[in-house]
Amino acid sequence: FYTLVLLLLIWASLYGITASGSQRWINLYFINLQPSELMKIAIIICFAKYYHRAQMYSVNKFTSIIIPIIILVLPIFLVISQPDLGTSILIALSGIMVLWLAGVNIKYFVVSGLILVITAPFVISFLQPYQKLRILSFLNPDRDPLGSGYQIIQSKIAIGSGGLFGKGFLKGTQGYLEFLPEKHTDFIFTLFSEEFGFVGSVVLLVIYIIIIYRIVAIGANSRSYFAKLFCYGFGAAIFVFITINMSTVSYTHLRAHETSLHLVCRLL
């Protein structure tokens, strides 16, 4: 599955559809496929299978670390080149979580973290100006209320206007009067909160918790190490994707396109 998705990523990078400055979709006529979304799951499956087979060896051997890193870096490089910084970060997080769950020594994560901190200024220098601006606007949306901070401000207004029980299905003003252009993806939770209010949002969170609990429980009761590792990794990934989507981090273009509501519905 990983190899297939990797080939789709290469195809998208070479012959894919370009929209909003990014070449990341494949036209299947009846739908546009974004392979980078599939890679979030493919990397979990691949790592779970790899460490299932590596049980007879030490997971902390050099080869047991370097091979997964190579497997992880290849799709990240392709996704960044599209460009899609946010999805590449989410793919990296998916892989890193499985590495941690597989029992990789904490020292590798510490060293990697130090390298990341040291190289951060160098990495930031490669960000597009609009990406830097949106990160700054996420930290302080009021600095540009009619520009890069617009959606975050409108998102807060929408959530607040939903009140306790919301305005009702398809009756949200911020969403359907186009104050939130990305309401169907980046700000889907905002739209939901406006229509169903605080109570509806809490119910949605409970549903998410139940789904994640069931996934983890299936893994805990599984006799297969592959199934156990996949379920734990998948549950952790969904939790991270939901957190990012709900915290509106996605608008900094650390995008979480369809990472919560859509991904869970499509896969489960």
Question: Each predicted region: which residue ranges?
Answer:
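Hydrophobic alpha-helical segments, chiefly the membrane-spanning helices
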Residues: 263-268
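TM-adjacent membrane-interface loops and short helices in multi-pass inner/ER membrane proteins
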Residues: 137, 141-185, 196-200
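Intrinsically disordered, low-complexity Ser/Thr/Pro-rich tracts
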Residues: 115, 261-262
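Conserved small/polar residues in nucleotide/adenosyl-binding loops
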Residues: 252-259
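Hydrophobic alpha-helical transmembrane segments of multi-pass inner membrane proteins, especially
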Residues: 1-151, 190-247
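Ubiquitous "structural anchor" signal
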Residues: 94, 111, 155, 163, ...
